[in-house]
Amino acid sequence: MAARDLVFQPGDRVRTSGRFVSGPDGDWLDLQRVHDLTIKPPGWKSDLSIRLIGADAAAVPSEFGPNQVPGHITVVGRWHAPAPGEQVRLGDESIEVETQTPEGPPPRPRADRTHPPCLPPPGGWPQNVVWYEGWPQSAVSDLDLDIRDLESSGAMVHRAIFRPSEDQEVLVVAATDVEAVTRGLSPSLPNQLCVVRSRFTRAQLDEVRDVLHAHFHEWRLEVFGTGSSDSQGQPFATAEPVRVTPELAAWDDTLPKGLLLLSPTITPPEIQHPDRQAGG
């Protein structure tokens, strides 16, 4: 699926999930996914809220259930917004609700980190974890190595801890210079290190980060970063826009496949799980 498949225009049908808010100024769906710990007054909504037309306040769930969070709903309906290029203010965008279900936002995808992408050493990965007051401790999780040279040179692109079992920890490193990283880390992590050749360089990830930062407000990004990796330990960048605009999609299509994962809050209705690897 290409990024352009996530683009929609005024009048198109869309799907989204969020927190239902009702007040004197009407019904809203607050799409904010990243929250701080401050207590908000009743009826508060973020600047990522969309006006709802025809929502059923009585059908909003008040209790937890399977894939159900109090106050949260999923809607499908017609998208209304100013023409492209016009300034968007709170309340200018709305969804004319066709269907409403008591479903919360879909969970963020999480990579499986139980199977390191390297063959285990003879005898298997060591039982190297000691639990202390409910927290795992090992040479991997307590890593105290000077890796600044490996990171600054670009030899080490990303590192993550894999846990084949609760008593095992393996450091998985995606590297552009496998030999240098192996030579630098293996003496301190015998039989606890897995180094794979990175699909992307640190420079590629940094360039994506810089572009996302420069267009943060224009593309209405809620959060972005370059610290993620998949089940093979391969790094990628992430971005969570409210929606994928034509401009964001055009830039995304220039990227190598797998370099960026887009997770828009609002999508065309046929797309159930918008998390996808970009550049395709």
Language model features by range: what are they?
Residues 1-235, 240-280:
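OB-fold and OB-like single-stranded nucleic-acid-recognition modules
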